[in-house]
Amino acid sequence: MSQVTVGENEGIESALRRFKRSVAKAGIFSDLRRIRHHETPVEKYKRKLKQRSRNRRR
């Protein structure tokens, strides 16, 4: 779960931007899309390939 604390002098727009960035980095939307729709074997292979390359970079 992504969580962002808003500073005293920080605007809501910048906090929302930081939240969206953290959600994208965590991969929450891609997981949601995968759960809601049927995933073909080719899509599954491509997703796992991307995940492997992401893990190698870390």
Swiss-Prot record:
One of its GO terms (molecular function) is structural constituent of ribosome. One of its GO terms (biological process) is translation. InterPro entries: Ribosomal_bS21, Ribosomal_bS21_CS, Ribosomal_bS21_sf. Signal peptide: none annotated. PANTHER family: MITOCHONDRIAL 28S RIBOSOMAL PROTEIN S21 (PTHR21109), SMALL RIBOSOMAL SUBUNIT PROTEIN BS21M (PTHR21109:SF0). HAMAP family: Ribosomal_bS21 (MF_00358). This is Small ribosomal subunit protein bS21. The gene is rpsU.
